[in-house]
A protein has these predicted regions:
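Short C-terminal beta-strand
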Residues: 157-167
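Two-component histidine phosphotransfer core
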Residues: 1-149, 161-163
Length: 167
């Protein structure tokens, strides 16, 4: 219950649409703890974070949405866990956030549709389109291809690379 309360407090905190990377990672940890209640062995979460970027300001629910998508769409089979790695690197002009999973991957057609901002299913909610729009706003409306890159191999992996300018 404590984890659920913490998650809802963080996600429903209106007025704080931009939060620190550290706060976003806490939201991700809470989300995964909640997801593990249904199936305790379904997700293995790994981190490779440059600690000097923990105060980096990012749109709330950015990484969480990508992790949620990995769990929702990437799991190969009911009893086969998915490994998700979150990497945050400091580059010269920007930070790079990478969320990678070893799930079912995406076809080239699906990647193209995502990059065009198309909804992939009728019930999809927050999703990648929202993440892209929010990152574009804080990145001086950079082009989609400058903000995000998707690499994927069907039945192998998906890697999403996001670039955020330093503010």
């Amino acid at each position: 219950i404590t984890t659920l309360a913490s998650y809802y407090r963080a996600t429903l905190n209106h007025g704080n649409d931009i939060i620190s990377l550290e706060s976003e990672l806490n939201i991700v940890r809470d989300y995964v703890k909640i997801a593990l209640i249904r199936n305790p062995n379904i997700v293995k979460l790994n981190y490779d974070i440059d600690d000097s970027l923990l105060n980096l300001q990012i749109p709330k629910m950015t990484i969480q949405t990508l992790v949620e998508n990995s769990i929702k769409y990437g799991i190969k089979a009911i009893d086969q866990p998915i490994s998700i790695t979150i990497k945050v690197r400091k580059l010269i002009t920007h930070a790079e956030i990478i969320v990678e999973d070893d799930g079912i991957g995406m076809s080239t057609d699906t990647i193209d549709r995502v990059m065009k901002g198309e909804r992939l299913e009728a019930k999809s909610g927050f999703g990648l389109k929202s993440v892209l729009n929010r990152i574009a706003l804080i990145n001086d409306n950079m082009s989609l291809k400058d903000i995000m890159e998707i690499q994927s191999e069907p039945n192998s992996y998906t890697r999403i690379i996001m670039r955020l300018k330093y503010k």
